[in-house]
């Protein structure tokens, strides 16, 4: 696909004279365009749901969720991956973000990195990619060689693959087993795909990782019951989670959390089933870590 023919490289009539308007009008133009992004994502919800189900199946069998991207796309993958351990208590290696150019590229532009097919393959080899893993290639244009080569290598290994782009019929979409293509149209600043396309990618990644965690028992109701208390705010959140899940008061919630080394799931089962910490943990283990299953009458 030629660059000049891509939707993400098109000219947006709504912003054709954005350099001549007031600051407030400038903001309105950008905001009006941003409003279209959730609607574009809504149109591909079935594709996102299909990807979540596959990711959950693979991760449940011992696989990992691997994000692969360049520039903004790579940074968004790293951002999503880095939030999973503190939010859901998973090991840091379960969700992995890879960016063309390596760690230096997180904060700096690395010339030519996205054009390196070898880089995409080598980065996956370096993390010991296996057929059980899922590789999600992220590229707004859908033409990034680093991502395409990585997806091709992953498929050769037998991995399930997902391609996220914002141009229909892109190479990323055709290379991946599952294509997620929110078409957000031309950017306010021509070709600046960190804007609407980046926002769409962020929304999709939010759904992929959150959907995986919900289906893995990391959420009870809408509570993040595997949150790790790494600061005072999260200590308070843990107490509120136990309170909201059980109806107990703050003192009871804190006492239960202390007794079970601050594991919200265990504390919730302790309170609701009147068990001690060891009994509650055993009950959870017997039910795969799912609170609802642990609470069912035996």
Swiss-Prot record:
Induction: Induced by MurNAc 6-phosphate that releases the repressor MurR from the DNA. Repressed by MurR in the absence of MurNAc 6-phosphate. Specifically catalyzes the cleavage of the D-lactyl ether substituent of MurNAc 6-phosphate, producing GlcNAc 6-phosphate and D-lactate. Together with AnmK, is also required for the utilization of anhydro-N-acetylmuramic acid (anhMurNAc) either imported from the medium or derived from its own cell wall murein, and thus plays a role in cell wall recycling. GO terms for molecular function: carbohydrate derivative binding; carbon-oxygen lyase activity; ether hydrolase activity. Pathway: Amino-sugar metabolism; 1,6-anhydro-N-acetylmuramate degradation; Amino-sugar metabolism; N-acetylmuramate degradation; Cell wall biogenesis; peptidoglycan recycling. This is N-acetylmuramic acid 6-phosphate etherase. Residues 55-218 form the SIS domain. The active site is at 83 (proton donor), 114. The keyword Lyase applies. GO terms for biological process: 1,6-anhydro-N-acetyl-beta-muramic acid catabolic process; amino sugar catabolic process; N-acetylmuramic acid catabolic process; peptidoglycan turnover. Its EC number is 4.2.1.126. CDD domains: SIS_Etherase. It comes from Escherichia coli O6:H1 (strain CFT073 / ATCC 700928 / UPEC). InterPro entries: Etherase_MurQ, Glucokinase_regulatory_CS, MURQ/GCKR, SIS_dom, SIS_dom_sf. Homodimer. It catalyses: N-acetyl-D-muramate 6-phosphate + H2O = N-acetyl-D-glucosamine 6-phosphate + (R)-lactate. Belongs to the GCKR-like family. MurNAc-6-P etherase subfamily. Keywords: Carbohydrate metabolism, Lyase. The keyword Acetylation does not apply. A lyase-type mechanism (elimination/hydration) is suggested for the cleavage of the lactyl ether bond of MurNAc 6-phosphate, with the formation of an alpha,beta-unsaturated aldehyde intermediate with (E)-stereochemistry, followed by the syn addition of water to give product. Coiled coil: none annotated.
